[in-house]
């Protein structure tokens, strides 16, 4: 963002409120292209190569200067195509660049907030595993959890209204409304469930929609974080990290006074000394030590909160109250639950010996094997029962390429699921991928698996399926006992910024 600021000539004054003229500047598109934000858009169009991408930008800007195209497109969109025959292409380019421009004031506020608060910005907070620090909390003493499905805005204007507090340029907001009403994918985005919506974000990579949805979540979470800090005896010191993940900081300070006046008389209803909250995709989990009555109050509070302040109608059935002792938390490929671990203590008093049985609550996080096998079966690595099969479409690749592909998939899955308390699921995945790789190579060489392994040796595949213990032995070469002990525990990596398709099997 420093590079953007130097090119744009923006300082901490009010200059960044006037964003609309930036759409007509060629260097904005060049910067977006260099940062890889619209690279696929500019280069995937048939008939254009890398050298002519700037020509596309020039042609687009020239068409925008001809105001008749925009006016006629709004008044009579059925007769006059928007920006010529390549309506979808040019509209997508402009929407991507517009999202970058609208992020400028938010990013500048982020920088000023970090400097004012003295917070060191870390790129590791972008890691998906930074969410899983939620599982390191002491859940064994909690009683209930709320599984919350965050509703989507029913009207597009709600998203635009949320940005009015940040962006003062009315022309940019009008252009945003134009893009939202022109896009045909938005209707399917807000009417589908969270699973389809999240997959739509990942596959279509619409930066503008992701930006708008993130701002919507920021509005919701800013108010909730304020109430959480007011109602909890244990003040949260890491709640800012939740907002930092989506690059919205100053909203907490801005909403503190507003929500203090609105909820000061009602906070006594929600006094809860132990609260644990996490959001992932379009869902969130709230854990508490409170009673069922308190959780039911939180449930109806969320419904009224969304309705009153965000004009979102949500049914109470979208929020589920579950008792943690007989319920499992499923999110992002992990399953967590509280189990009773029996323990026996032998006590001796004089000549009499006693054996005391005691059950200790233990919070375990595992990887369910059946959904993972389903993902492998969907990708044609095994059948529905988990029996490995060869990858026929890879049989034309070279041997090293085939082995590298299988090894990379296993390392990604092992890396992502390293937070599991038990490694049996990963051993099963390793078995499936190794045998599938062997059958693919045997199919290529028109041989059997046994004959192929006898000819080349099983060591050919072993080196590409690196165990976590071997990784730690390379990291700590002089302390082998520590590496073996760490490899058996839950490990969260801070370099995972996207979910592998096989890992996202919900």
UniProtKB/Swiss-Prot annotation:
It comes from the Eukaryota. One of its GO terms (biological process) is RNA splicing. The keyword Disulfide bond does not apply. GO terms for cellular component: chloroplast. Keywords: Chloroplast, mRNA processing, Plastid, RNA-binding, tRNA processing. It is found in: Plastid, Chloroplast. Pfam families: Intron_maturas2, MatK_N. The keyword Plastid applies. One of its GO terms (molecular function) is RNA binding. Belongs to the intron maturase 2 family. MatK subfamily. Usually encoded in the trnK tRNA gene intron. Probably assists in splicing its own and other chloroplast group II introns. This is Maturase K. It comes from Lactuca sativa.
């Amino acid at each position: 963002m420093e590079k953007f600021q130097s090119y744009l000539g923006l300082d901490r004054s009010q200059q960044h409120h006037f964003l609309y003229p930036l759409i007509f500047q060629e260097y904005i598109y060049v910067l977006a292209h260099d940062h890889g934000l619209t690279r696929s858009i500019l280069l995937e169009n048939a008939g254009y190569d890398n050298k002519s991408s700037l020509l596309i930008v020039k042609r687009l800007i020239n068409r925008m200067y001809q105001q008749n195209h925009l006016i006629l497109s709004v008044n009579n969109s059925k007769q006059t195509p928007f920006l010529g025959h390549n309506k979808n292409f040019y509209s997508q380019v402009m929407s991507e660049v517009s999202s970058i421009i609208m992020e400028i004031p938010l990013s500048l506020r982020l920088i000023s907030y970090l400097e004012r608060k003295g917070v060191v910005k870390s790129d590791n907070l972008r890691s998906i595993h930074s969410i899983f620090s939620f599982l390191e909390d002491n859940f064994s003493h909690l009683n209930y959890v709320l599984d919350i499905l965050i509703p989507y805005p029913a009207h597009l204007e709600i998203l635009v209204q949320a940005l009015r507090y940040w962006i003062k340029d009315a022309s940019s907001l009008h252009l945003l409304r134009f893009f939202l009403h022109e896009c045909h994918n938005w209707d399917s985005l807000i009417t589908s469930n969270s699973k389809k919506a999240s997959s739509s974000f990942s596959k279509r990579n619409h930066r503008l929609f992701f930006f708008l949805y993130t701002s919507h979540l920021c509005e919701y979470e800013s108010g909730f974080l304020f109430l959480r800090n007011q109602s909890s005896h244990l003040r949260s010191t890491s709640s800012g990290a939740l907002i930092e993940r989506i690059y919205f900081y100053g909203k907490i300070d801005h909403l503190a006074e507003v929500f203090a006046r609105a909820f000061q008389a009602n906070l006594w209803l929600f006094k809860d000394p132990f609260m644990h909250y996490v959001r992932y995709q379009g869902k969130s989990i709230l854990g508490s030590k409170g009673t069922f009555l308190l959780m039911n109050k939180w449930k109806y509070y969320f419904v009224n909160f969304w309705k009153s302040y965000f004009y979102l109608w949500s049914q109470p059935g979208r929020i589920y109250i579950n008792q943690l002792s007989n319920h499992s938390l499923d999110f992002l490929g992990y399953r967590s639950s509280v189990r009773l671990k029996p323990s026996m203590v032998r006590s001796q008093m004089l000549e009499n010996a006693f054996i005391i049985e005691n059950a200790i609550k233990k919070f375990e996080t595992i990887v369910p094997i059946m959904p993972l096998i389903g993902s492998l079966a969907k990708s044609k690595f095994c059948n529905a029962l988990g029996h490995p099969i060869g990858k026929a479409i890879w049989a034309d690749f070279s041997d090293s390429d085939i082995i590298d592909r299988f090894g990379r998939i296993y390392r990604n899955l092992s890396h992502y699921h390293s937070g599991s308390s038990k490694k049996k699921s990963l051993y099963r995945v390793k078995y499936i991928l190794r045998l599938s790789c062997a059958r693919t190579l045997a199919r290529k060489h028109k041989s059997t698996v046994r004959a192929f392994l006898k000819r080349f040796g099983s060591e050919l595949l072993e080196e590409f399926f690196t165990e976590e213990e071997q990784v730690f032995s390379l990291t700590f070469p002089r302390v082998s006992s520590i590496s073996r002990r760490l490899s058996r525990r839950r490990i969260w990596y801070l370099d995972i910024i996207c979910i592998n398709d096989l890992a996202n099997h919900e």
